[in-house]
Amino acid sequence: MASQSTANPNVLSLATIGSVARLLTLTGATLTTGLISGFFYAYACSVSLGFALLPDEQYVEAMQAINATVRNGVFTFSFFGAVLFLVLALVIYAPRMRSLRFLLIALAAVLYIGGGFMATFLINVPMNQELALVSSDAAPATPAQIRAEYEGPWNFWNGVRTVFSSLSFLALIGACLSRSDSG
């Protein structure tokens, strides 16, 4: 008598679920990292250049307004989502840690978390918080002094996080294109 398989063809196999999980986490990491690197890039090549043309008082007010509104759901999804998806991708691809794909994901995680994410948290956000405390009525420093201390360093560190986030995005594109999923 021939043995019949008891597997239900309508049930996804663990291998299929694993493949889908790997695809979704790598796609999520690539998408969110691309979005946030594009956000930082747009700031560097348009917003900062436009703000450079503003008089000092308007510059301070404009930066305060943007900093007050940037914390929203769309930004949160890309900024924190990149960390979440990168970590998930590392965990899911860990059994394939000798593969080129895993190494590129690990490189992307180090670049984004160590460069883009941490620069934002350790430097740009504290600078933004200090700027938020400045009141045009009660400021001990003039808008020109405030701007002189803020603009150059803030733009420099935005450039740093732009470069690191963009390199992370490129590493993830490499991971997506890699045919090596075993090692």
Language-model region placement:
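Hydrophobic alpha-helical transmembrane segments of integral membrane proteins
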Residues: L107-Q129
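Hydrophobic alpha-helical transmembrane segments
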Residues: T76-L90
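Interfacial segments of alpha-helical transmembrane regions
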Residues: I17-T33, V91-G115
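Structural signal for membrane-spanning alpha-helices in multi-pass inner-membrane proteins
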Residues: F40, L86-Y93, T120, L172-C176
